[in-house]
Amino acid sequence: MANSRRVSRVSSLIKREVSQMLLHDIKDDRVGAGMVSVTEVDVSGDLQHATIFVSIYGSEQAQAETMEGLKSSTSFVRRELSHRMRLRRSPEVVFRQDHSLERGDRMVHLLNQIKDTIPEEEGITEEE
């Protein structure tokens, strides 16, 4: 079992490499249907499994197409990781869609709606 510092380093390295693959190496047109970015990579303690969280900007259909393209390219990503990284075994790769940015955006939108509906009280300004 790898120590937590090594797991963290491998995780950040996988994030960087997969981001580069998304930009330059994955040729599947479905992956280009939505704007994709790697938000986080969770690597198991034994470095055998990597869950790659991606944020996809686009319509629901574009997001679904992009996830299908990513799922079909997992073997390519795993093979490329084995070439680019010095690991005894290349981790099994699973792509998951990260909805946290969408939830955060929705939360900001709701807070702005609340702010607009509440009348400003006397003596209270936004500068405080």
Swiss-Prot record:
GO terms for biological process: maturation of SSU-rRNA. The keyword Cytoplasm applies. The keyword Transcription regulation does not apply. It is found in: Cytoplasm. One of its GO terms (molecular function) is ribosomal small subunit binding. Signal peptide: none annotated. Pfam families: RBFA (PF02033). InterPro entries: KH_dom-like_a/b, RbfA, RbfA_dom_sf, Ribosome-bd_factorA_CS. Its main location: cytoplasm. One of its GO terms (cellular component) is cytosol. Keywords: Cytoplasm, Ribosome biogenesis. PANTHER family: RIBOSOME-BINDING FACTOR A, CHLOROPLASTIC-RELATED. HAMAP family: RbfA. Monomer. Binds 30S ribosomal subunits, but not 50S ribosomal subunits or 70S ribosomes. One of several proteins that assist in the late maturation steps of the functional core of the 30S ribosomal subunit. Associates with free 30S ribosomal subunits (but not with 30S subunits that are part of 70S ribosomes or polysomes). Required for efficient processing of 16S rRNA. May interact with the 5'-terminal helix region of 16S rRNA. This is Ribosome-binding factor A. It comes from Rippkaea orientalis (strain PCC 8801 / RF-1) (Cyanothece sp. (strain PCC 8801)). The gene is rbfA.
